[in-house]
């Protein structure tokens, strides 16, 4: 973690090259400690970005978690789409997605929001909540409980709006509570998570 923060600070200081040899810590060790988000500004090489994301997921995500989603389709009359985020408040993610939530064709889709966002009382939060057919707070639940709750709602497609950004809860995805899981918007790069389709 210390190396990750050192790389981050050098980026903020515009101290180039970021991966300067420290003697005891090689540039290769620094690259291995770089987050997926930080790698976006350090390299345009897709392989380097994937390696950074996978390194993070290997360090942070529990292994061998039970898969909760069934292999067969649920067969609902409407496809259940759920959005997972801590940014359903006065935040750029909500600014960019509120209309998206509102525009889902309700004759074909049932829209869920699973959140651990702060209750900021903003008009934007109220708009996001109103745009969901079901808005469910999971802030008091641990990752296993949150994943089970998502599974209990028989979500067909789970859309994570974080990726590997601050506030993310990728371990929820690691339980694979939905048959199809994707990420959108929060991190404009790969997550490197094997549980994301």
Regions found by a protein language model. Give the residues of each.
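Alpha-helical solenoid repeat scaffolds of the TPR/TPR-like class and their adjacent stem/linker regions
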Residues: 1-197
């Amino acid at each position: 973690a210390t190396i990750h923060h050192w790389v981050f600070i050098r980026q903020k200081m515009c101290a180039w090259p970021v991966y300067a040899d420290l003697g005891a810590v090689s540039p290769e060790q620094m690259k291995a400690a770089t987050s997926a988000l930080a790698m976006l500004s350090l390299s345009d090489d897709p392989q380097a970005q994937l390696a950074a994301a996978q390194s993070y997921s290997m360090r942070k995500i529990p292994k061998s978690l039970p898969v909760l989603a069934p292999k067969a389709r649920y067969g609902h009359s409407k496809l259940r789409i759920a959005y997972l985020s801590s940014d359903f408040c006065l935040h750029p993610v909500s600014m960019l997605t509120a209309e998206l939530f509102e525009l889902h064709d309700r004759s074909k889709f049932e829209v869920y929001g699973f959140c651990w966002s702060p209750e900021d009382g903003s008009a934007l939060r109220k708009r996001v909540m109103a745009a969901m057919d079901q808005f469910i707070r999971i802030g008091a639940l641990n990752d296993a409980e949150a994943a089970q709750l998502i599974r209990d709602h028989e979500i067909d497609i789970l859309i994570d709006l974080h990726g590997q950004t601050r506030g993310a809860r990728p371990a929820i995805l690691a339980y694979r509570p939905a048959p199809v899981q994707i990420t959108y918007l929060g991190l404009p790069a790969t997550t490197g998570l094997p549980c994301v389709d």
